[in-house]
């Protein structure tokens, strides 16, 4: 009996009469499930296939002629070929255009009939779609290339036309503005994020432009727009913005007398307008909220005018006093406020040739005795604190010493004072004529030496180079010593440390004349005007005819510095310093001075000198002096003129002005002292100007229009020394060491036992100053003084300035 499953009851249990077969039932169930799943998968696959087929059909069936832009991009090379063909056609290159159209598969009739719109043609089975070509006279490709190349040159800094440069600048400006906008937007977003993180953000809308204007200080509306205009218009502070921050910190000092020192007034709320904060406030009144300070380097002073003592406001209260500096810590504000007589702490940096040779000379017993006898007492002077004075033995007055101290970088305002001081020295009595009676000339008194302050070792030697001048001396014609200075190029490796110009002073006092010593020291007590590189200044002297010269170069070391701080003994022919004799000076040994002060000859030569043998002195200026002023004080008894009187043409014709001033000089005691001699002026004959002087009974008339004359035979009390009218020396004739001793200009009283060999001589000293003599461009002038009836003792002092 077979079992037949009912279709309506698939899960029915068969009757018990038929046996149950489990395996068969299981197979039937699996087959049913498989059929169901297969049908579902087939259904899904069919749907997917249908969708794919639909998409493919849509892509295939989509019309390509409707989207022209996409077609141009897909056919970009065809478009370029079209413009190339158009350019070749309009450039009259027909053969080239035909060959190019054939190779590029283009329609040859296209160049003749420009296409107005897209068309499709079939050529050899290939579909070629042509886009519209812009019609231009020379071809669109050519014009496009011109614009492109112009802008490319402008952007690459290779030139370009003016229009291209303007266009490029506009493009750059737009790019910069966009960059600013983007940076401000990022900054505003960061501020908003910080405010939200701190819980201070209330959905405000921050405009980046307003924020940028507020940060730049421009007056604009607040950057934060308020939601309700009726609420309190106080902006919400944001920590990220440093300008909007408001910290309620009390000020350092509140100098408000009405509210008190401890009261703090409320400050105005911050806003975007910052124009009325600083400039409109009164600086003479205290501003609440601004700290009040004083400069720590300035003392507190009461200022009734109301000028501010600091950068904020004036401190007029007593509860805020800054510490006051002690007077020793106060500094000079300007260099011109320094007085002229203030001594400087720096000593001289220069050392003469004789002082450098101190360590090489062994001081013997004789040198020690001379140093013991010749030591002068140095005392601080009252007229010039920068240079001490020398007290000569036997004299109660002090003389200015040649010390090493100098004023560095003399201000421009002090030059006039220095000129006036020099004018007083050149115009009035000799500064060394105020000493009282000295011992007689028979008693041997040593010459005063100059004590020098110890110098400091300096490491910096980059100064002006020293010029070396070898001097050759020779005795000619019975004692006529002619010395010429030869210039030698200075070495580049050695640099001089001296910048001041020394003076050479001969026969300055009685003791020097007595011992036949030649001593050098400064001729003025004012600071040296050559300490700093001077400039051309106007003449400040009371004499309009005097020309001090134009200082065009920095002062260099004078070759006369080798004689500085030493004494010359004409008897022994040696230079003696503080430590004894230094070196011998004779005709074979050259000295480093261009000024030849010849040694007095002995024996017959001295007798010839005493018997009025004419002498000649050739003076050459130092190397490097652009304008040289020569100051000579002659103590000659009598000056005889020579035959060829030549005077430089650079001497001004201002003799009448000087004559009127000198003629009214109250210091003169004679009627014919102030007569000027200007009739001997002639044109110069050569570069070396020779200056010869007339034979004058009264030497005071020995003046040129630009020379300063000063009477040196008077005391500071305007009392004439009558004893100076006589000669101060005797000539025995048989003594080789006997010299012609002119009278001293320091007021020495002569005894009755001293008789004069020349009774007709007038022994008044002459102070001559030659300014701008013999100046030739690019040539150093030489001064040839043909002096007759004079010797080396007639030169009181010779000073180079320039």
From Swiss-Prot:
Superkingdom field: Eukaryota
Region ranges (Disordered): 1-20, 28-71, 104-130, 258-409, 434-506, 566-625, 647-757
Keyword field: Activator, Nucleus, Transcription, Transcription regulation
Compositionally biased tracts (Basic residues): 357-373, 485-500
LisH domain segment(s): 76-108
SMART domains: LisH
Record field: compositional bias (Polar residues): 1-10, 28-40, 273-288, 321-343, 374-399, 587-596, 663-678, 698-757
Primary residence: nucleus
Keyword Transcription carried by entry: yes
GO BP: regulation of biosynthetic process
InterPro entries: LisH (IPR006594)
Compositional bias (Low complexity): 41-58, 310-320, 344-356
Subcellular location: Nucleus
A single cellular component GO annotation: nucleus
Recorded family membership: Belongs to the FLO8 family.
PANTHER family linked to this entry: LISH DOMAIN-CONTAINING PROTEIN (PTHR45093:SF2), TRANSCRIPTION ACTIVATOR MSS11 (PTHR45093)
Primary role: Required for diploid filamentous growth, haploid invasive growth and flocculation. Putative transcriptional activator of FLO1.
Protein name, UniProt field: Transcriptional activator FLO8
The species this protein was found in: Saccharomyces cerevisiae (strain JAY291)
Annotated gene: FLO8
